[in-house]
Swiss-Prot record:
Its EC number is 1.14.-.-. 2-oxoglutarate binds at R264. PANTHER family: 2-OXOGLUTARATE (2OG) AND FE(II)-DEPENDENT OXYGENASE SUPERFAMILY PROTEIN-RELATED. It comes from Dothideomycetidae sp. (strain 11243) (Fungal sp. (strain No.11243)). This is 2-oxoglutarate-dependent dioxygenase frbH. Belongs to the iron/ascorbate-dependent oxidoreductase family. Residues 169-273 form the Fe2OG dioxygenase domain. Fe cation binds at H194, D196, H251. Residues 77-97 are annotated as: Disordered.
């Protein structure tokens, strides 16, 4: 890391997966503080050989898939926010007057579990790999929720995991992103600033580009990839369920060197609450988890001026800076 990169890097704490799995009390308190102060943290996965191998397997799949022609990938399009292919430039980008510049392949957890007919052909063809990855990412994020519930001594009805029952439908989704190499900037840029919709995001990426809006010092800071580590962040739902104790940090994706000089790949598992879970959202509104999801995706596609007119895009967090 260069001296300038070090200056521009966000400080995030690093937690150990194996210590959280074993319900280590000290690690649990570090987890609570990370969620309260930063809303982001690194999770060291190197104790879990299977998860590291699955990461490599999904990256290999992405390298093959995203190199297909656009016509071939569009066969997987489902015009959905939770499954299928989505081409570049469908939402507002990270800079004024430009759209986003990423493409994605998504797989809904519920539909993968049931092998739904809605699954994109590319997901069906790689069902075993993607199903296992989703199982493991889901297990890790649910374990984190349980540790937070223990730390806060929540009663059964208020435990965070109680809003994520296996028997209930949810919009939890695996999303595989490619930010294509760019020759010119005017085609689009990055991924616009936002807070995540759901409860927790489990992110795997080996390349720079993710930025978090820091409170001290105020400004955008790059999240440096660490070998063998996931980046975990708090989403709006966990912020709402915690009574705003936990922080859903504003973040974006933007090229480090103005243009995206090489393809950038990232894998995100978005843990989301069951669809009918009731949330006390921004402005004192009461909404279901599904309605918050749908409303926020609608805002992603609006103009920058329309996005600035309410607090949905950044979950009200930008006002707290």
């Amino acid at each position: 890391m260069s001296q300038q990169e070090a200056v521009d890097a966000a400080f995030l704490p690093t937690l150990d997966l194996s210590r959280l799995v074993s319900s280590d009390a000290e690690e649990r308190q570090k987890l609570v503080r990370a969620c309260e102060v930063y809303g982001f943290f690194y999770l060291d996965l190197r104790s879990d050989a299977e998860l590291i191998a699955l990461w490599t397997g999904v990256l290999d799949l992405m390298g093959q898939y995203f190199n297909l022609s656009l016509d071939e990938k569009m066969r997987d399009s489902r015009n959905s926010d939770t499954h299928g292919y989505e081409p570049v430039a469908t939402s507002t980008g990270a800079q004024d007057d430009l759209p986003d510049y990423y493409e994605s392949l998504k797989a809904s957890r519920d539909e993968v579990l049931t092998q739904s007919s809605k699954l994109a052909p590319a997901v069906k063809a790689n069902h075993a790999l993607l199903n296992r990855f989703i199982e493991r990412a889901h297990a890790v994020t649910m374990m984190i929720l349980r540790q937070l519930s223990i730390a806060l001594e929540l009663d059964d009805s208020h435990k965070f995991e109680a809003f994520h029952r296996h028997s209930e439908e949810s919009l939890s989704t695996l999303s595989m992103f490619r930010y294509p190499k760019q020759e010119v900037l005017d085609v689009g840029v990055g991924h616009n600033k936002h807070t995540d919709i759901g409860t927790l995001t489990f992110l795997l990426c080996q390349q720079q580009g993710l930025q978090v809006l820091s409170k001290d010092p105020v400004g955008w800071r790059f999240v440096q990839p660490l070998p063998g580590c996931a980046v975990i962040n708090v989403g709006d739902t966990l912020r709402f369920l915690s009574g705003s104790r936990f922080r859903s940090a504003v973040h974006r994706v933007i090229p480090v060197d103005q243009l995206q000089r090489q393809d950038r790949f990232s894998i995100a598992y978005f843990l989301r609450a069951e669809n009918n879970a009731t949330l006390n959202a921004v402005g004192g509104r009461t909404v279901s988890a599904k309605d918050w999801h749908d409303e926020k995706f609608d805002v992603f596609r609006k103009s920058r001026e329309a996005q600035a007119s309410d607090d949905v895009l950044t979950g009200g967090m930008e006002r707290d800076m």
